[in-house]
Amino acid sequence: MKSNHMQVEAICNGYVIDHIPSGQGVKILRLFSLTDTKQRVTVGFNLPSHDGTTKDLIKVENTEITKSQANQLALLAPNATVNIIENFKVTDKHSLALPKEVENVFPCPNSNCITHGEPVISSFTIKMIKGNIGLKCKYCEKTFSKEIVTAQV
């Protein structure tokens, strides 16, 4: 039995991150510090998706997603979409693209890396390795899987 009833309330203005893999929504909330915002944030976990799987969803009112946030989001949820909402209507829809690099977001997992002892910001080059996302540290030059780098988020 299919229902067209919305399971997560509509927002007037802001953005919606849709098609987040189940379980990644919490990481995105932490990464974007959405638990600290004064704006209304509506979250849905394990919602049914059209393909029969489940997904997470995040709606943020009266806020715009930044390019930096979109790049970070592409690492955690590369197949997610970002919908821009104005006056309760979707005015723009963006698919995500992996950035070439990401800076000052994730710590280097290598405990011997200079980023842990010197006043430098972390910096990773993004690479696809055998169909998986890899992040190469600018300083120690070690490459890590996306899962290892984002595990502490």
Swiss-Prot record:
Swiss-Prot/TrEMBL keywords: Metal-binding, Pyrimidine biosynthesis, Zinc
Cofactors, names only: Zn(2+)
Binding-site positions, Zn(2+): 108, 113, 137, 140
One record GO biological process: 'de novo' pyrimidine nucleobase biosynthetic process
Cofactor note: Binds 1 zinc ion per subunit.
GO terms assigned for molecular function: metal ion binding
GO cellular component terms, semicolon-separated: aspartate carbamoyltransferase complex
Described purpose of this protein according to its UniProt entry: Involved in allosteric regulation of aspartate carbamoyltransferase.
Family, similarity comment: Belongs to the PyrI family.
Subunit structure: Contains catalytic and regulatory chains.
Name of the featured protein: Aspartate carbamoyltransferase regulatory chain
Gene that specifies this protein: pyrI
